Design a protein with these regions (language model features):
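Bacterial N-terminal signal peptides
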Residues: 5-15
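Long, charged/polar, surface-exposed segments that mediate recognition or autoinhibition
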Residues: 64-123
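N-terminal secretory signal peptides that target proteins for export/translocation
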Residues: 1-2
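Short, low-complexity, Pro/Ser/Thr/Gly-rich segments in the mature regions of secreted, periplasmic
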Residues: 143-158
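A mature extracytoplasmic/lumenal domain signature
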Residues: 86, 118-119, 130, 139-141
Length: 158
């Protein structure tokens, strides 16, 4: 009888749940992991727990790849970076950067703001008021002449 009551309650709540989900756009699939990257940035170990194999220079692979992003890596001890999917034109990359900016801001919530004096039309800086962490979203051209949006999380050294 208890199981039947629980099943009924679950089924009765389905329309309300579906309505609530459709009323609010779904968070991008990388939100939880992006928040985790930001949280790791301010720990004593920084990104050591997600560091993978060494790459040329001072880069390392990362064990924490943001869903929908590619070529995620660590640079030094305090920088995490990922590229978006490649696009054909710079205009597409600019539009994607604007959309991703809105997504990232919604993922991270209050406390994050654009720093206009450090931003440009193709480069946006977000800073957290309470923690020494910044995020940049910039456009770049690959060696194969395609365009990407690059997300970079780094620890500010003020």
């Amino acid at each position: 009888m208890k199981r039947l009551a629980m099943l009924f309650l679950a089924l009765a709540s389905l329309p309300a749940t579906a309505l609530a989900q459709s009323a609010h756009p779904q968070a991008p699939p990388y939100c939880f992991d992006l928040s985790r990257v930001v949280d790791l940035a301010v720990t004593k170990e920084r990104f050591a727990s997600i560091a993978g194999r060494p790459r040329p220079g001072d880069f390392r692979d990362t064990k924490l790849v943001l869903a929908g992003w590619k070529d995620c890596s660590l640079y030094g001890a305090a920088t995490y970076t990922c590229d978006s999917a490649e696009m054909d034109t710079a205009e597409q990359a600019d539009e994607a950067r604007r959309d991703l900016l809105d997504d990232v801001k919604s993922c991270l919530g209050a406390g994050w703001a654009e720093v206009a004096e450090r931003s440009s039309p193709s480069y946006v800086v977000l800073q957290n008021a309470a923690r020494p962490v910044s995020i940049t979203l910039s456009t770049d051209q690959t060696d194969s002449k395609r365009h990407v949006v690059r997300l970079t999380v780094f620890v500010r050294r003020n």
